[in-house]
Amino acid sequence: DREQLARFGPWSECSNGFLPDGSRYGCKKDPSIPLSATNRPSIIDANGMSSPGPGLLRQLNRVWLVTPARDTAYPVGIEAGLEQFGVTLEAGREAFVMHPFHSRSYIASGGTPQRLAIATNPEYRIELWSMTGKLERIIERPGARQTPPPEEIARAHEYMASQLRYMDQATRDRVLAQVPTPDSLAAVAGLAMTPTGELLVQREGFLLSHPASMWDVFGTDGGFLGSIRIPGHMRLLAAGADHLLVMRRTPDDAWLVEAYRLKR
C-alpha cells in the first residue's frame, strides 16, 4: 500500500487514514493555497535546522482522496493541523506551544453513497465532498464561536505550564507570557457521520465548565434536524444508524463505555 500511495506523493504529516469503502485520505502541500503570517513555510537555517519561526502557526494542506484501487487521487478540502504558537529561546532555539483553545481540523465519513466531511476550523463551516472530489454541500453557522470564560482561561494556563515542566521555571514563565490566549474558541469540537449519512457536529462538551456535550445533527440534504445533548463530558467512539457509542472518564479515573439509542 505504501508503494501504491507513493506515486501520488510527496505526502505531508497530517491527519490520514482509511475510510469505510477502502479509500484512503492524506494531505499534500498545495502551492495554490496562499501563504500568510500564520500559514508560513519552514526555513532551513545555517545550522541545517528547519523551522517556520516564532508566532502563531497554522500550516494548511490539501486533503486528497485515494480510491480503493489506489489508481486515482482526488483533491478535496483543506486540513489545518494543530494550531501552535512559536517562541524564540536562547541560542536561536524555539519552542512551539499548543494552547488548549487553539483549533484543529476534523474529518469524518459515512453515508451511502459515501461522503467525506471536513471541518477546517475555527469557523462553523463543514464541507461535504463526494469520493470523486466534488464539493457537494457546505454547512455553515455564523457567529458560532464562543468566548472562553475566565475560569477556563486559568485552567488552560495551568495545563500549558504542566506541559512545559521540562523547562526551568524562568524559561517556562517567559514562554507562557508570550503565548496569547485566543479571544474565542473554535466552533467545531468534533465531527462524525452515521452509516446513513447524517452529519453530527459537536459544539460543546470539551470544557469543564460545559455541563453537557452538544451535537448538532444534519440530514443527508443538509437540513438541520436538531441537537443531541448528552450530560457530562464524553468522547464519541462511533455513530451508528440508530445509536451513539461514547466513552467517558468516571470519578475514580476509570473509563466507561456507554451506548445511547437514537430516535428519529
What are these regions (language model features)?
Residues 1-264:
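Eukaryotic scaffold repeat domains enriched in small/polar residues
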